[in-house]
């Protein structure tokens, strides 16, 4: 039974340091072997690759670009009318992943359009998402990369996000049916939406390609006060044979 491997999420850790190169150095100095970052696109990939190398780190996860955040976008995968922008963002993410030696890309689903009713647009958004995911799976397969789907809770963090439960994400993955598309399990979001962590971890772990953790409700470090028993959860992941990284 292999011990868990941890990656520093530089979108959340070392916020006092400006720029990713400085955060990479801090992560290396803190003893991490791996890092992840949501959006590395403000820096040139060659600069980040060199900084990671010098810090003795491997990059294990990035996200597709969020889209136009000033207009409220947070990913484009399921957003009707934004298919071309999603595919352009995917190309950019693949370019960064190749330069950084990063094997996984979180394919962000995006938000229900402002003013739209979630129930009314759900079917259309799922059709768009399925089309984009089939395209992404083909692009990623050519580069030996894995795409990830992450449910984000709609109770606290992002009420408009389209993909919000592991059950919804797993059903979409089954419909796409591509082996290089997997589930990204953020225990913070799963606890808020559904609880039942032991059951859900055991049920969905076979299709999980990456795990993220934060305490609930404050989204602090696992050691911070909150409702989650991380020693138990980490042991459960080990016992169930999880071999990926925990961010």
Enumerate the language-model features and the residues they cover.
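Generic structural signal for well-ordered alpha-helices
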Residues: 24-25, 45-49, 90-94, 130-137, ...
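N-terminal pre-domain/capping segments
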Residues: 1-102, 123-124, 174, 178-182, ...
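Short, glycine/acidic-enriched loop or turn micro-motifs at the edges of active sites
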Residues: 39, 153, 187-189
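Glycoside hydrolase catalytic-domain groove-lining segments
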Residues: 163, 174-180, 191-247
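A generic structural signal for short coil/turn motifs at secondary-structure boundaries
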Residues: 15, 156-160, 219-223
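Conserved, mostly hydrophobic/aromatic
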Residues: 8, 27, 35, 52, ...
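Short, glycine/charged-enriched secondary-structure capping and boundary segments
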Residues: 22-24, 49-52, 119-123, 161-164, ...
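Active-site acidic/histidine proton-transfer and metal-coordination neighborhood
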Residues: 54, 76-182, 192
């Amino acid at each position: 039974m292999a011990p868990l491997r941890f990656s520093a999420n530089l979108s959340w850790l070392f916020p006092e340091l400006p720029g990713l190169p400085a955060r990479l150095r801090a992560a290396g100095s803190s003893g991490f072997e791996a890092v992840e970052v949501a959006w590395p696109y403000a820096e040139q990939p060659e600069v980040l690759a060199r900084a990671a190398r010098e810090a003795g780190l491997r990059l294990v996860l990035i996200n597709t670009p969020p889209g136009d955040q000033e207009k409220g976008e947070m990913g484009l995968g399921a957003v009707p009318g934004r298919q071309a922008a999603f595919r352009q963002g995917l190309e950019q993410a693949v370019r960064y992943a190749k330069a950084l030696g990063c094997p996984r890309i979180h394919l962000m689903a995006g938000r229900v359009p402002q003013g739209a009713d979630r129930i009314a647009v759900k079917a259309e958004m799922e059709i768009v998402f399925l089309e984009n995911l089939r395209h992404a799976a083909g692009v990623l397969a050519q580069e030996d990369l894995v795409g990830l789907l992450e449910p984000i809770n709609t109770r606290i963090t992002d009420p408009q996000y389209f993909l919000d439960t592991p059950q919804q994400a797993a059903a979409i993955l089954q419909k796409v049916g591509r082996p290089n598309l997997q589930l990204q399990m953020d225990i913070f979001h799963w606890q808020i939406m559904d609880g039942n962590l032991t059951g859900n971890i055991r049920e969905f772990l076979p299709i999980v390609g990456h795990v993220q953790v934060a305490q609930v409700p404050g989204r602090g470090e696992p050691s911070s006060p909150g409702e989650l028993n991380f020693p138990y959860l980490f042991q459960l992941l080990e016992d169930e044979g999880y071999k990926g990284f925990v961010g």
